[in-house]
């Protein structure tokens, strides 16, 4: 991002300063997002909330969309204070987001989490997991790998768009949500550990992914069409 900062009209010092706030607060956002949809896990027997358990992130429970939302909020405030073009900064920031998400998914592999359902495909992943309290060997979809590769491909695609076809501030920002939303929506359907919308059968990340992708695509078409005319 620092290497390409000048092309987007952003100072390298502003990137470093923004990361100082965005990184820790994005972790907080990822945790709060997870807690929101699993609130019952953080209640004591008397119904009160266990705030100690809420802050123990080493026990698991971070959701990427919470981190993304918090990062956008932090960037908005930062740009307002520093009088920087938000959409230009956001265009630059999505490249770091994709790299971070691409690498971060391998943490799921190390922790043996965020995998998919059973499959017989040649690239299946063998794991030991507990099913109804019994430890069993399973061959499953390596959904962490799917998303990591999707982010890698998205990064390469957005780099080319930024170099050749970037027409307006916000184009890369919208392209990120369009690309990631579609991929996450389909991959989420394969996972076995999804967050669900308050007791329904609706997968939160799948819904959020498809909705944000649809909105982003519409805004891209409108903005590109307007500029072409």
Set out the residue ranges of the language-model regions.
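A feature for loop-to-transmembrane-helix boundaries and adjacent hydrophobic helices
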Residues: 1-229
């Amino acid at each position: 991002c620092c290497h390409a900062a000048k092309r987007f009209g952003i100072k390298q010092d502003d990137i470093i300063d923004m990361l100082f706030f965005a990184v820790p607060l994005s972790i907080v956002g990822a945790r709060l997002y997870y807690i929101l949809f699993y609130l019952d896990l953080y209640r004591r027997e008397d119904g009160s909330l266990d705030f100690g358990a809420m802050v123990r992130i080493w026990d698991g429970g971070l959701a990427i969309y919470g981190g993304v939302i918090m990062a956008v909020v932090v960037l908005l405030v930062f740009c307002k204070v520093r009088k920087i073009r938000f959409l230009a900064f956001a265009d630059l920031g999505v490249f770091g987001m994709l790299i971070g998400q691409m690498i971060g998914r391998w943490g799921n592999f190390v922790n043996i989490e965020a995998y998919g359902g059973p499959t017989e495909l040649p690239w299946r992943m063998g794991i030991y997991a507990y099913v109804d309290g019994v430890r069993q060997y399973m061959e499953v979809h390596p959904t962490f790998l799917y998303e990591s590769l999707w982010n890698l491909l998205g990064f390469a695609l957005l780099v080319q768009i930024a170099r050749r076809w970037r027409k307006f501030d916000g184009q890369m920002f919208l392209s990120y949500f369009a690309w990631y939303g579609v991929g996450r929506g389909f991959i989420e359907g394969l996972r076995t550990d999804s967050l669900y919308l308050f007791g329904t059968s609706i997968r939160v990340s799948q819904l959020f992914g498809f909705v944000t992708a649809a909105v982003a695509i519409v805004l891209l078409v409108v903005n590109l069409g307007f500029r072409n005319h």
